[in-house]
Swiss-Prot record:
Region (Disordered): 144-163
Official protein name in the record: ATP-dependent protease ATPase subunit HslU
Localization per Swiss-Prot or TrEMBL: Cytoplasm
Cross-referenced SMART domains: AAA, ClpB_D2-small
Assembly and oligomerization: A double ring-shaped homohexamer of HslV is capped on each side by a ring-shaped HslU homohexamer. The assembly of the HslU/HslV complex is dependent on binding of ATP.
Primary localisation category: cytoplasm
Family as reported in the entry's similarity comment: Belongs to the ClpX chaperone family. HslU subfamily.
Length: 455
């Protein structure tokens, strides 16, 4: 992350996609900026400064997950979102919490590999074109030229070579312009190693994955001739050439460093592994998961197939609705590891109006763009937008509060007929008015039983 990404810049970027929730945006912006600040310190102090993990508290659909997702994109950091309910205490059937870090490393390796391939794109593209040109214009064989043209002057051989090079360049330009995209050729490609299914005991996913890698590596690099269009052949050849040009060991080393220094783990549904205040006694599946999370959040060393990972400087963002349980129902040790608490507010009508209109790729803009592909110009009156927001808010209040996700349900119902008939519509300019919204959604909202199942 560069120095340019100040907390204000980060918040401004988040506001392009997320409406409201300024406290949460500020908290994550400061946490991200502290990453950069830490990297400016001397080595001794840097090791002592650990990230201040965040606990987001708020109902579903108010932006908790979206904030974390956008933050990871801004930071260009390895990011993984997991649900706390998917894990069980070590020794019980199910995934153990250390698999979070292993999955995070896999994400980082994939990310760094893509970055490395991007750097060699130009060279890989050139090599891929050469492979295609070798098929289209096979180079003259050396042995043939020695036998067949023993008395041929050196000048003639040179001019033939020059002519061949000119022809190749003409065809190279045709390939680059896409003029030969649909022409079929036969090209030699690497055969993907067969994946061997390994059945392992529950919770031993890492071991089974390593065994699969071992069996795959035992299979020799086989090649086979495959018939395909030049367009597809270029893409395949470019991927193969890029894979040869990148240094896998360097990728792994950089991925491990990225995880240790900049990794972000988003723990969703943390409230679902809380012990309810009213319950007495320990709950193995719930409290055990929290106790297993403690070493990860506090800082420990996890073994992965790429190497050892220290979790001391990984940022953990936990979130939960806390409808039934309270944050104080988390075990005290875990509460202490989540020092920054941010409460996200429920969405009001005004928030729904802004969500429909303001984000860069708002719901309305998405539907307008989708209909545009059918030649339909869709527009919404201001009063109609407010009416949609009011309906979404009302259904949330009366049925179940699912936050901004309710807007998707309402919009799908509202535009169902238009979406279905779009290809055959004669009138291509459609303006959504308040009357249209009332006609399509009015009865459903009034009838609570219907809205419960349809909206």
């Amino acid at each position: 992350m560069t120095q340019i990404m100040t907390p204000k810049t980060i918040v401004h970027e988040l506001e392009r996609h997320i409406i409201g929730q300024n406290d949460a945006k500020k908290a994550v912006a400061i946490a991200l900026r502290n990453r950069w600040r830490r990297m400016q310190l001397d080595n001794e102090m840097r090791q002592e400064v650990t990230p201040k993990n965040i606990l987001m508290i708020g109902p579903t659909g108010v932006g908790k997950t979206e904030i974390a997702r956008r933050l990871a994109k801004l930071a260009d950091a390895p990011f993984i979102k997991v649900e706390a309910t998917k894990f069980t205490e070590v020794g019980y059937v199910g995934k153990d919490v250390e698999s979070i870090i292993r999955d995070l490393v896999e994400t980082a390796v994939k990310m760094k590999r893509e970055e490395a391939k991007e750097k060699v794109t130009e060279k890989a593209a050139r090599l891929a074109e050469d492979r295609i040109l070798d098929v289209l214009i096979p180079p003259a064989r050396t042995s043939e030229s020695k036998v067949g043209f023993a008395n041929e002057p050196a000048e003639d051989a040179a001019s033939k070579k020059e002519k061949e090079n000119k022809t190749r360049e003409i065809f190279r330009k045709k390939i680059q312009k896409g003029e030969l995209d649909d022409k079929e050729i036969e090209i030699e490609v690497a055969v993907a190693p067969k994946t061997i299914g390994v059945m392992g005991p529950p919770g031993m996913e890492d071991m089974t994955s390593q065994l699969q890698d071992l069996f795959s590596s035992l299979s020799t690099d086989k090649k086979k001739n495959k018939k395909m269009r030049i367009k597809d052949a270029i893409k395949l050849a470019q991927d193969e050439e890029a894979a040869k040009l990148v240094n896998e060991e360097d990728i792994k080393a950089r991925a491990l460093e990225a995880v240790e220094q900049n990794g972000i783990v988003f723990l969703d549904e943390i409230d679902k592994v809380c012990r309810k205040s009213s319950n007495s006694g320990a709950d193995v599946s719930r409290e055990g998961v929290q106790r297993d999370l403690l070493p990860l959040v506090e800082g420990s060393t996890v073994s992965t197939k790429y190497g050892m990972i220290k979790t001391d400087h990984i940022l953990f963002i936990a979130s939960g609705a806390f409808h039934v349980a309270k944050p104080s129902d988390l075990i005290p040790e875990l509460q202490g590891r989540l020092p920054i608490r941010v409460e996200l507010k429920s969405l009001e009508i005004e928030d729904f109006v802004r969500i429909l209109r303001e984000p860069d790729c708002s719901i309305l803009k998405q539907y307008i763009a989708l209909m545009k592909t059918e030649g339909v110009d869709l527009s919404f009156e201001e009063d109609a937008i407010r009416k949609i927001a009011e309906i979404a808010y009302k259904v949330n209040e009366e049925v179940e509060n699912i936050g901004a996700r309710r807007l998707h349900t309402v919009m799908e119902r509202l535009l169902e007929e238009i979406s279905f008939d779009a290809p055959e519509l004669v009138e291509k300019n459609i303006n959504i008015t308040t009357d249209y919204v009332n006609e399509k959604l009015g009865n459903l909202v009034k009838n609570k039983d219907l809205s419960q199942y349809i909206l």
